[in-house]
From Swiss-Prot:
It comes from Mus musculus (Mouse). Disruption phenotype: Mutant mice display no obvious phenotype, but display increased blood glucose levels when fed ad libitum. After oral or intraperitoneal glucose administration, they display increased blood glucose and lower plasma insulin levels; basal fasting glucose and insulin levels are not altered. Ca(2+) influx into beta-cells is unchanged under basal conditions or upon stimulation with glucose up to 8.3 mM; Ca(2+) influx is decreased upon stimulation with high glucose levels (16.7 mM). Residues 1-22 are annotated as: Disordered. The gene is Trpm2. This is Transient receptor potential cation channel subfamily M member 2. The lineage of its organism: Eukaryota, Metazoa, Chordata, Craniata, Vertebrata. ADP-D-ribose 2 binds at S1378, D1427, R1429, Y1488, N1490.
Length: 1506
């Protein structure tokens, strides 16, 4: 079988014959798998060959589920192949058939029937396809039968080929032959097509061949692949081609699968066949068992596209049905047919103007009214755009083209013309999205589902510009709850502009943010997010502690634990642990919000669980944290702009980002975090600056206000934790710190006054010191003394004096009075040190915020000066212990002497308060780090030179101390100029050394001669080594160290002011909390504190000035004031942004572009106005000419004048319109063009009958239409009372028209109609079909449409209004399988008053009452109905009666509702069950078109909204 297949396919190229012209109906579609250059992206799943296991699965699955078609009976055809061989009717030769197909000659002469002679067999062509001589491009291919179910092909593509479900189908159709496009237009098309496919995750479906529009698409994908990287995305291009038309297809036949199959692209030898395009990624090759027959793939492709478009795809957290759009380039008759079918199926089409032929014809007439699209106009356009084949067009074809183009243009909502350079359509991707939105907006839906669908598309594709201009308009008022699902989707997919848009359109975060929403957001963090990994660690730790097998579910207290690590332990948990962690909540492990596009309310799918508190304390804070931890810059900025406690929020975000940046491994992400942290710090500075300018006192309150939302911390504490030096160095904050530093003293007091009062405190009573509060000036002496000595500045200086006294006493004891038995001075030092120990202990255990001992210890030892204090105290204790033991007295004194150095170093902390010396401490710290790393470099040279020198000079030195001296110590001193005297041999002396190294106080002598008086080592070598060592160590390395110091100094010096201002806070805070008495008198304060805490159990008081808990009302007022000033800050920022030169240039450019567009539009309007005026003038001249012609003719007939000299006043016009056509053109076009439209649809409903095309101008019977030859169709109906079936007038001879014919009323509301050859003629004109069609009677078929309405009322009973007008509700019904509703009416039985359908939904006992209501109703319409079932000889006429219930308590209304039922029990055996509902009257109600017109008249009758 395999060899036969190969032989058969091998001769297909030579034996092809009679190839039909290809139908250019190639639709296209692009997937969104990430793709780049194949040589760089070998790991891509569809470019890599399947693994052996996958190949085996595919080799077994495809033959079982996918078939091919083979001709099993050879029936000789009358035609020969191109090589002159006999072929079968299928197009293949004898050799290309199976053995069972070769039958005796008895089968010859019989007609070949594909239904009998073609059978399905397991396919033998599938696998990977490799195009030879074209690098290493690899695709997928499969040969399928034309009857293969679409679901099987879809399963193959998504499950076995591994394609992601598309977000969009782009069906590209157009010219099947090569055509030329402008370079710019070609570039725009290629770029836009690939862009929309790559960014939206679309599939592009084309015909797959290497010609025409398919080649254009392939080249677009190729260009993208060559210029992109693996990360930029992959474009999936699927070619659906006919197997029997593929050149060189024999190489694709592999019964067990080709992995890979090589395919040669041979354009020169393809003949009438076609080659596959090498730039397509997947091929579906449709087989019907024939050879050389084009268009076989069209039905399967149409079904496949329809099947895929009915699937649901989730994108950006939103589930929508996969939309489809048709993109048209160039094309011929087949393309026109494809566009026509797409428009009729509701598929939006994008026509690329400038691509040629059909596309340009449609683009040229798309803006014209349908009445102006005439046969002559289309003929003129065809002569321009189809110059080569215009002569082959017949009159029937031109009429058909005119009719189809009229129907296409009539549905403008589905037609989008892409014009190069058109405003708002700079690229094809914008045109495609606009086409989908325009089509969606035109659909009929109840309520907001239609707008919701449009918004889903815009969010899924991240096109906020179109959403702003096309969706959020005055046509629909969005409710905030309707936007909540979209808001969640925008947040998860990081689309900040949509978040801003939703906030602008009414979304309130307090209503949007719930516990379930937050959990949804946190559960859907990106796995690469650092916060996500931290959460996983917390959950794993909880699982470990609980000895649980499964990972616990995420709760907000887990998030709070991670946040506390980032914010610092000065904050409390933002989300406390709930009492019941297993409370009911939504399971949101997947970020998708299930939203069905077709008529399901968003609100019904976005309900929160009830029974517990759902809303958070501060929703803006919660969203802000979520955005910040993911480093979403724009999103965080938008949410911060909504925050109330904005200064604290900005500082907290700065802290979180800086902490995350320390752990982030990705350098780029870390830098972005730091940049965003700086941005938030600047925002905090900006808001605080506005507040401080407005009111200094209230601004300073903001600094120390306890923020409940941010863990009961303060703005100042957050800034310090985040090390926001710029914020802390702000003038307002420094003024506040200065105020705290001076306590209740005036800042104007000089330091010398403070010191004098400390030395002579009675000066306090003389007014020598001034206080901030005037009341202290007049208070009694104790209050003034207390205020003075409690000021931090006084406490600081008193402690300085005390510390200097301690150091002096310590030095005195060490140098003068260090006795075997301690003196009173030494005992005083012990007491002094004990007071220092007590103070350090107090600082360690002081925990007013309840952080815990371990955390307080961690915070305590995080300070360098505290470490130094502890080290000095411990060293003192060690020295004291040794000192008290007589045997270790001297070592004890040494230890205490070293300890004195540490106590002296502690003095540097005092310099922090100095603006000059404070930054220098930082410089010293950083230089010490520089020295530490520098020593590693220096050690290399020191050790290398020292070892070499020691080895050259000294032989076998065994004393370790002298080795160390020779290698390290002497080498180190050499750097500073202490060069050994003997190294050059000049000052060599044996007296200064020990020959054998026996003298412990002398070094061993260098190598000497046998006399021992002269050196034996090479002096030149040691001198050379010394010079090199000094060059590198003394010059190079020391200068490097100096340069490092200089860099450190310059770096710190640039930020001296900020560093000093930041440092002084720690000192101020320390002395603000210290007891007022200095050591050792501080022991009294410690004793008092001990009694309060231990004995009296009095808790520690907070520092009121550094942490202030405000009353609720005061806090609310303060935050409102801050919010107001934040708005001022944001406005100033926007103004400054607009004043930037770059922004001004951009604004000017946009204004110039707008002005140019307006001028162009004005020119077009003027040109159009001129053309209209000329046409009007031409028509007036024609009328005058005809009038004069009539006058002349009348005068001549009356005997006035002779006919010989009469002038011809009616000249032959170029268009030569008859009078009837002139009257047609005078008609004003209405929405229905003035003619019946539905009655002229080419395909008759529920039948495979095609109407004869009837353009608008040929509708009236008076218009001459010589080629009019409509088919005849009369359906057989199972109703007894119907007219007979027949295409002749004989069976109808007994029918009497224009009268009441027995029980049938054949009179028309439009008067007497014409009866021609026994058939009545439709009074509205031609329809393109003769006969009765599916109607019951020839002539008029009368129907009744009751329009039952009532006012729409709210829960309170008041009438609802929209745009000032009252709103109506109408009673409608529909079949379960129908998408549209209808009025409860229809045809009536002869002699009956109520329609049949109305009787089925109304109980029989109410029929008489309803007839009474009909007689009392108001007739709103009576006449012809434009129905698709109408024909030339049968049509529908209706009477519409309005039945309105003004009062909701109307007894007849209640009876009507009681007697309505969903279906008639007698009709249970039928599939015609009707349902009824009350629906709001609106122009978008999904109602049949003719019924909607009636409903509009009823709304106008009552002045209601429509």
């Amino acid at each position: 079988m395999e060899s036969l297949d190969r032989r058969r396919t091998g001769s297909e190229q030579e034996e092809g014959f009679g190839v039909q012209s290809r139908r250019a109906t190639d639709l296209g579609m692009v997937p969104n798998l990430r793709r780049s250059n194949s040589s760089l992206c070998k790991s891509r799943r569809f470019l890599c060959s399947f693994s052996s296991e996958k190949q085996e699965n595919l080799s077994s699955w495809i033959p079982e589920n996918i078939k091919k078609k083979e001709c099993v009976y050879f029936v000789e055809s009358s035609k020969l192949s191109d090589a002159g061989k006999v072929v079968c009717a299928c197009g293949y030769t004898h050799e290309q058939h199976l053995e069972v197909a070769i039958k005796p000659h008895t089968f010859q002469g019989k007609e070949w029937d594909p239904k009998k002679h073609v059978q399905e067999m397991p396919t033998d062509a599938f696998g990977d396809i490799v195009f030879t001589d074209l690098s290493q491009k690899v695709g997928k291919y499969v040969r399928v039968s034309q009857d293969t179910p679409s679901s099987v092909i879809y399963q193959l593509m998504t499950q076995h080929w591994g394609l992601d479900v598309p977000n969009l189908l782009i069906s590209v159709t157009g010219g099947a032959k090569n055509f030329n496009m402008k370079l710019r237009l070609k570039s725009i098309f290629r770029r836009g097509l690939v862009k929309v496919a790559q960014t939206t995750g679309a599939w592009i479906i084309t015909g797959g061949s290497h010609t025409g529009v398919m080649k254009q698409v392939g080249e677009a994908v190729r260009d993208f692949s060559l210029s992109s990287s693996c990360k930029e995305g992959e474009v999936i291009t699927i070619g659906v081609a006919t197997w029997g038309t593929i050149h060189n297809r024999e190489g694709l036949i592999h019964p067990m699968g080709g992995f890979p199959a090589e395919y040669m692209l041979d354009e020169e030898g393809q003949g009438n066949l076609t080659c596959l395009d090498s730039n397509h990624s997947h091929f579906i090759l449709v087989d019907d068992g024939t050879h050389g027959q084009y268009g076989v793939e069209i039905p399967l492709r149409t079904k496949l596209e329809k099947f895929i478009s009915e699937q649901t795809k989730e994108r950006g957290g939103v589930a929508i049905k996969i939309p489809i759009v048709c993109v048209v380039l160039e094309g011929g008759p087949g393309t026109l047919h494809t566009i026509y079918n797409a428009i009729n199926n509701g598929t939006p089409c994008v026509i690329v103007e400038g691509s040629g032929r059909v596309a340009d014809v449609i683009a040229q007439v798309a803006t014209l009214p349908v009445s102006e699209i005439t046969i002559s106009l289309i003929q003129q356009k065809l002569s321009i755009f189809f110059q080569e084949m215009f002569e082959t067009f017949t009159e029937n074809q031109i009429v058909e083209w005119t009719k189809k183009i009229q129907d296409i243009v009539r549905r403008r909502q589905l037609l989008t013309i892409f014009r190069e350079g058109k405003d708002g359509q700079q690229d094809v991707d914008v045109a495609i999205l606009q086409a989908l939105l325009k089509a969606s907006r035109s659909q009929d839906h109840f309520g907001h589902e239609n707008w919701d669908h449009q918004l889903k598309l815009a969010v899924a594709w991240n096109r906020v510009d179109i959403a702003r201009s096309e969706i959020f308009t005055d046509e629909w008022q969005w409710k905030p709850a309707d936007l909540h699902p979209m808001m969640t989707a925008a947040l998860i997919s990081n689309k900040p502009e949509f978040v801003r848009l939703f906030l602008e359109n009414g979304v309130r975060l307090k209503e949007f943010v719930t516990w379930d929403t937050l959990l949804c957001l946190y559960e859907n963090l990106e796995p690469s997010c650092l916060f996500h990994s931290k959460l996983q660690k917390v959950l794993a730790e909880e699982q470990r502690l609980a000895y649980a097998s499964a990972t616990p579910r995420l709760h907000m207290h887990h998030v709070a634990q991670v946040l506390r690590e980032l914010l610092g332990d000065s904050t409390q948990l933002l989300y406390p642990r709930p009492r019941y962690t297993d409370r009911p909540r939504l399971s949101m492990t997947v970020p998708h919000i299930k939203l069905n596009v077709q008529g399901v309310s968003l609100r019904s799918l976005y309900k929160r669980s009830t029974g517990h508190v759902t809303f958070t304390i501060d929703p803006v804070r919660d969203l802000l944290i979520w955005a910040v931890i993911q480093n979403h810059r724009e999103l965080a900025g938008i949410i911060w702009a909504q925050s109330q406690d904005c200064t604290a929020a900005a500082l907290a975000c700065s802290k979180i980002l800086k902490e995350l940046s320390k752990e982030e491994e990705d350098t780029d992400s870390s830098e972005e975090m730091l940049a965003l942290a700086d941005e938030f710090e600047h925002r905090a500075i900006g808001v605080f600056t506005e507040c401080y300018r407005k009111d200094e006192e209230r601004a300073q309150k903001l600094l120390v206000r306890v923020s409940e939302a941010w863990g009961k911390t303060t703005c100042l504490q957050l800034a310090l934790e985040a090390k926001d030096m710029k914020f802390v160095s702000h003038g307002g904050i420094q003024a506040f710190l200065t105020k705290v530093w001076w306590g209740q003293l005036c800042v104007d007091n000089g330091l010398w006054r403070i010191i004098l009062c400390m030395l002579a405190f009675p000066l306090l009573f003389t007014g020598f010191i001034s206080f901030r509060e005037k009341r202290l000036q007049a208070l009694c002496r104790p209050a003034r003394v207390r205020a003075f000595f409690n000021a931090p500045v006084v406490i600081f200086h008193m402690n300085i004096l005390s510390y200097f006294a301690f150091l002096c006493l310590f030095a005195y004891v060490l140098m003068v009075d260090f006795q075997p038995s301690p003196s009173w001075c030494e005992y005083l030092i012990y007491l002094w040190l004990f007071s220092l120990v007590c103070e350090e202990t107090r600082q360690l255990f002081y925990d007013p915020d309840g952080c815990g001992l371990m955390k307080m210890a961690s915070l305590y030892f995080s300070d360098f000066w505290n470490k130094l204090d502890v080290g000095a105290i411990l060293l003192f204790i060690v020295g004291l212990t040794c000192r008290l033991i007589p045997a270790t007295l001297y070592p004890g004194r040494i230890i205490l002497s070293l300890d004195f150095i540490m106590f002296c170093l502690r003095l540097m902390h005092i310099f922090t308060i100095s603006k000059t010396l404070g930054p220098k401490i930082i410089i010293v710290k950083r230089m010490m780090k520089d020295v530490f790393f520098f020593l590693f470099l220096l050690a290399v040279w020191v050790v290398s030179f020292g070892v070499a020198k020691q080895a050259i000079l000294i032989h076998n030195e065994s004393r370790v101390d002298w080795i160390f001296r020779g290698v390290v110590y002497h080498s180190y001193l050499t750097i500073f100029g202490q060069i050994p005297t003997y190294i050059d041999g000049v000052n060599f002396s044996m007296d200064q050394c020990s020959p054998n190294g026996t003298d412990p106080y002398k070094p061993k002598c260098p190598e000497s001669d046998w006399t021992g008086q002269a050196p034996a080592f090479p002096e030149w070598l040691t001198v050379t080594l010394l010079c090199l060592y000094l060059l590198f160590a003394n010059i190079l390395l020391l200068n490097l160290l100096i340069a490092m110091f200089n860099y450190t100094f310059q770096e710190v010096q640039e930020h001296t002011d900020q560093i000093w201002k930041f440092q002084r806070h720690d000192l101020i805070e320390e002395y603000h909390g210290r007891p007022p008495a200095p050591p050792p008198l501080i022991l009294l304060s410690h004793l008092q504190l001990l009694i309060k805490r231990i004995v009296l159990k009095i808790p520690a008081k907070r520092h009121k000035q550094l942490k202030n808990k405000l009353e609720k009302n005061e806090e609310t007022a303060l935050l409102s004031w801050e919010l107001y000033l934040k708005e001022n800050y944001l406005q100033n920022q926007q103004y400054q942004q607009k004043q930037r030169p770059e922004q001004k240039i951009q604004d000017i450019s946009e204004k110039v572009d707008t002005m140019v567009d307006l001028l162009d539009m004005d020119q077009v309007k003027r040109s159009g106005s001129t053309e209209q005026r000329l046409a009007s003038l031409e028509e007036q001249v024609t009328q005058v000419t005809r009038a004069l012609h009539w006058i002349v003719t009348t005068l001549k007939d009356s005997g006035f004048g002779s006919g010989a000299g009469a002038l011809t006043l009616a000249p032959q016009r170029a268009f030569d319109e008859p009078d009837a056509e002139l009257s047609i053109r005078r008609k004003v076009e209405e929405p229905g063009d003035g003619y019946h439209v539905s009655a002229r649809h080419l395909l008759y409903p529920n039948a495979r009958i095609m109407r004869f095309p009837v353009p608008n101008e040929k509708v009236p019977w008076a218009a001459e239409f010589l080629i009019y030859d409509p088919p005849f169709y009369t359906a057989e109906k199972d109703v007894a009372l119907t007219d007979p079936v027949g295409d002749t007038a004989e069976p109808l001879s007994k029918i009497s028209y224009n009268v009441v014919d027995g029980p049938t009323d054949r009179r028309s509301f439009h008067g007497v109609y014409v009866v021609e050859y026994g058939f009545p003629l439709n009074p509205m004109g031609r329809t393109g079909l003769r006969g009765r069609g599916s109607l019951s009677w020839f002539g008029p078929n009368h129907t009744l449409q009751p329009v039952v309405t009532r006012w729409k009322r709210n829960q309170g009973g008041a009438i609802c209004r929209k745009s000032v007008r009252k709103m109506l509700e109408v009673l409608v019904m529909k079949l379960p399988r129908s998408e549209h509703w209808a009025l409860p009416g229809g045809s009536r039985e002869p002699g009956e008053m109520l329609p049949r359908k109305l009787k089925r939904v109304l109980r029989q006992e109410f029929w008489v009452a309803f007839e009474t209501l009909l007689m009392q109703g108001t007739e709103v319409y009576k006449g012809y109905v434009d129905d698709p079932r109408n024909t030339d000889n049968a049509w529908i006429e209706t009477v519409a009666v309005s039945i309105h219930f003004q009062d909701q308590n109307d007894m007849e209304l209640k009876r009507l509702e009681e007697n309505l039922h969903t279906h008639d029990p007698k009709e249970l055996t039928r599939d015609l069950k009707l349902s009824t509902e009350w629906q709001v009257v609106d122009r978008r109600i999904p109602l049949y078109a003719n019924h909607k017109t009636i409903l509009q008249k009823v709304a106008s009758l009552f002045g209601a909204h429509f």
